[in-house]
Amino acid sequence: FITAAFGIPQISTGDMLRAAIKAGTPLGLEAKKIIDEGGLVRDDIIIGMVKERIAQDDCKNGFLFDGFPRTLAQAEAMVEAGVDLDAVVEIDVPDSVIVDRMSGRRVHLASGRTYHIAYNPPKVEGKDDVTGEDLIQRDDDKEETVKKRLDVYHGQTEVLVGFYSKLTGEHAPK
């Protein structure tokens, strides 16, 4: 809705990383190993990707970050680069709900269609509604991996709430 209303792109580091993984690039292969283990891809890689992306023409009137920044270093790098944010939104969801939602997700890899075993199940369990092909659970959606990612979030990302609430001056979001 926001991207359509303002005519701006959504910038998802997750989507950028998944594209690199699918393409089998060196970055993609490195990222896949880290992501599958529940870790976060190194800040320097993510920051470089984001800076490159927001320099593209379609971002000249703005953009919507999705899942970025995830670490204090990433947030500080954006401030240092003079990237002004109009607003920052935190969506606070209990860990148990996140584990349930993510571990219940199933994907048809060829099309990207996404299902959920409880909230949006396919017509036939484990099969894509359109093709009848198998659905998979991505490695990063497995319960143990989700729990590891939440531990990383609490250790590295949660501090951003305080960072943005204390940020003042010309780069402070509303």
From Swiss-Prot:
Sites where the protein binds AMP: T13, R18, G39, L40, V41, G67, F68, P69, R70, Q74, R138, R149
Compartment(s) where it occurs, according to its Swiss-Prot or TrEMBL record: Cytoplasm
Domain of life: Bacteria
Keyword Transcription regulation part of the UniProt annotation: no
Pfam family, one: ADK_lid
Annotated spans, LID: 104-141
SUPFAM superfamilies registered for this protein in UniProt: P-loop containing nucleoside triphosphate hydrolases (SSF52540)
Chief place of localization: cytoplasm
UniProt keyword list: ATP-binding, Cytoplasm, Kinase, Nucleotide biosynthesis, Nucleotide-binding, Transferase
Record NCBIfam families: adk, PRK00279.1-1
Protein name (Swiss-Prot/TrEMBL): Adenylate kinase
Organism: Neisseria animalis
Biological classification of the source: Bacteria, Pseudomonadati, Pseudomonadota, Betaproteobacteria, Neisseriales
